[in-house]
Amino acid sequence: MHGNRPSLKDITLILDEIPEIVDLHCDEQFDSSEEENNHQLTEPDVQAYGVVTTCCKCGRTVRLVVECGQADLRELEQLFLKTLTLVCPHCA
């Protein structure tokens, strides 16, 4: 199509070619142990949790965000219930 305006003689339609049909489904199967290994290799669900507590020296509010799994969050909670305390930047 060269020129100022396209004309019908410039357009060629090829109607006798049929597109090839391709199966997009994968028929590959994994061993069950291989699937379990892949599942175990994925990282545990990590989420951000906000922690709000008070400074052990002056009583100011201390806020922080931790990223961990639920099991680690429970351990952190147990530490706060025992002896772990936070100090604010002013008292540090």
Curated annotation (Swiss-Prot):
SUPFAM superfamilies: E7 C-terminal domain-like. A motif (LXCXE motif) lies at residues 24-28. GO terms for cellular component: host cell cytoplasm; host cell nucleus. GO terms for biological process: DNA-templated transcription; symbiont-mediated perturbation of host cell cycle G1/S transition checkpoint; symbiont-mediated suppression of host innate immune response; symbiont-mediated suppression of host type I interferon-mediated signaling pathway. Residues 1-43 are annotated as: E7 terminal domain. Highly phosphorylated. Keywords: Activator, DNA-binding, Early protein, G1/S host cell cycle checkpoint dysregulation by virus, Host cytoplasm, Host nucleus, Host-virus interaction, Inhibition of host innate immune response by virus, Inhibition of host interferon signaling pathway by virus, Interferon antiviral system evasion, Metal-binding, Modulation of host cell cycle by virus, Oncogene, Transcription, Transcription regulation, Viral immunoevasion, Zinc, Zinc-finger. Pfam families: E7. GO terms for molecular function: DNA binding; DNA-binding transcription factor activity; protein domain specific binding; zinc ion binding. It is found in: Host cytoplasm; Host nucleus. A zinc finger (unnamed) spans 55-91. Signal peptide: none annotated. Homodimer. Homooligomer. Interacts with host RB1; this interaction induces dissociation of RB1-E2F1 complex thereby disrupting RB1 activity. Interacts with host EP300; this interaction represses EP300 transcriptional activity. Interacts with protein E2; this interaction inhibits E7 oncogenic activity. Interacts with host TMEM173/STING; this interaction impairs the ability of TMEM173/STING to sense cytosolic DNA and promote the production of type I interferon (IFN-alpha and IFN-beta). Belongs to the papillomaviridae E7 protein family. HAMAP family: PPV_E7. The E7 terminal domain is an intrinsically disordered domain, whose flexibility and conformational transitions confer target adaptability to the oncoprotein. It allows adaptation to a variety of protein targets and exposes the PEST degradation sequence that regulates its turnover in the cell. Plays a role in viral genome replication by driving entry of quiescent cells into the cell cycle. Stimulation of progression from G1 to S phase allows the virus to efficiently use the cellular DNA replicating machinery to achieve viral genome replication. E7 protein has both transforming and trans-activating activities. Induces the disassembly of the E2F1 transcription factor from RB1, with subsequent transcriptional activation of E2F1-regulated S-phase genes. Interferes with host histone deacetylation mediated by HDAC1 and HDAC2, leading to transcription activation. This is Protein E7.
